[in-house]
Design a protein with these regions (language model features):
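Conserved beta-strand segments of alpha/beta enzyme cores
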Residues: 4, 24, 80, 113, ...
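Rossmann-fold dinucleotide-binding core
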Residues: 87-182
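Eukaryotic N-terminal low-complexity, Ser/Thr- and Lys/Arg-rich leader segments
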Residues: 1-3, 20, 57-77, 101-110, ...
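NAD(P)+-binding Rossmann beta1-loop-alpha1 motif at the extreme N-terminus of oxidoreductases
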Residues: 1-41, 61-75
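Short catalytic-loop micro-motif centered on adjacent basic/acidic residues
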Residues: 41, 81-84, 116
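Beta-loop-alpha module in the N-terminal Rossmann-like domain of NAD(P)-dependent dehydrogenases
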Residues: 43-55, 91-92
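Short glycine-/small-residue-rich Rossmann-like dinucleotide-binding loops
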Residues: 43-44, 86, 240
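Helical "substrate-binding/catalytic lid" subdomain
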Residues: 170-284
């Protein structure tokens, strides 16, 4: 199984991680759809629609399908596009409509099949003890009839789970999960910052450890780990709020809550030194006390 990527507009740290994993770089979007049966979109949520449009445009180029037929041994013209980003079900249906509108002259069959998806859990970690990988769960939904013979292998390799036939279901599951993890982290930042401002953070941490240790561990670990990812979570919080209102029928209450959480992460990413943190190169916010003090100071300076 060949793994390929497009190096356009990626940061140096991301490129270093990709190259370390021996993933092959391709020069253009067209090369990607010519040489790939499956295209997996994993980008910041704000870039999800733009990425889908890039693939759409590449598939519409007049020589894409003929070159793909020459490259692929099967000669199959169809590309399978998975959006695995933390975006609202409404946006997934919009992307599905986009690909459904794709029309290629003299091509009777659909040239692309879209599947909704989401990644639940952290990045893969290799366990030296049992020599197995701990992998995140990749949930997908949408029509799966007629998928190629290589699809079961992809499911097994990536720990994919089909959760339903409808576009949007996988995203709803992903966002419902994230609301309880990243949402809790945003709430923890509000709590820890307030306690720090009043000089009672040590007492708060002590009481969490004594009376609700599991909550305390989740809250402190989340607060420490979030800094390098806060910029990605801004749109994810908004997507959660939208999903709660549109799919959960909360009538605006979901957006009221999670738009506020989005603002928490925006402040972290854009108004504090925590926004400069990089995964694997942490300098600040490695302890919850430092996170709370940085945010408390930033809030004082805003008023």
């Amino acid at each position: 199984m060949r793994i390929e990527f497009l190096p356009l507009e990626l940061g140096g740290d991301t490129l270093d991680r990709i190259k370390a994993a021996s993933i092959e770089a391709l020069p253009t979007d067209q090369d990607l759809v010519i040489q790939s049966d499956y295209v997996l979109s994993v980008v910041p949520p704000r870039d999800s629609l733009a990425t889908a449009r890039r693939i759409f445009d590449a598939l519409q180029l007049p020589d894409t399908l003929s070159k793909r037929a020459q490259f692929c041994a099967s000669g199959s013209p169809k590309v399978y596009f998975f959006d695995l980003n933390a975006t609202a079900p409404r946006l997934m249906r919009e992307i599905d409509d986009l690909f459904a509108s794709l029309s290629v002259p003299e091509q009777k069959e659909a040239t692309v099949q879209f599947l909704d998806g989401g990644i639940i859990g952290g990045p893969p970690v290799y366990n030296e003890t049992d020599q197995n990988w701990k992998r995140p769960s990749i949930v997908i939904s949408g029509p799966v009839e007629g998928l190629p013979s290589t699809f079961p292998s992809l499911l097994s390799t990536l720990d994919m789970k089909i959760v339903g036939p409808n576009i949007g279901s996988a995203s709803a599951l992903k966002l419902s999960f994230a609301s309880l993890t990243k949402g809790l982290t945003a709430l923890s930042l509000l709590s820890f910052t307030t306690a720090q401002s009043e000089g009672v953070l040590p007492e708060l941490l002590q009481h969490l450890n004594e009376y609700s240790p599991k909550t305390g561990a989740l809250a402190t670990n989340g607060a420490v780990a979030m800094a390098p990812k806060a910029y990605r979570w801004v749109e994810e919080m908004r997507a959660i709020g939208e999903a709660f209102d549109s799919e959960g029928h909360w009538g605006g209450l979901g957006s009221d809550v999670f738009d506020s959480f989005a603002e928490v992460y925006r402040r972290v990413a854009e108004e504090t030194v925590l926004g400069e943190e990089k995964i694997g190169q942490r300098q600040r916010g490695k302890e919850v006390e430092d996170v709370a003090e940085i945010l408390a100071r930033a809030n004082r300076e805003r008023t």
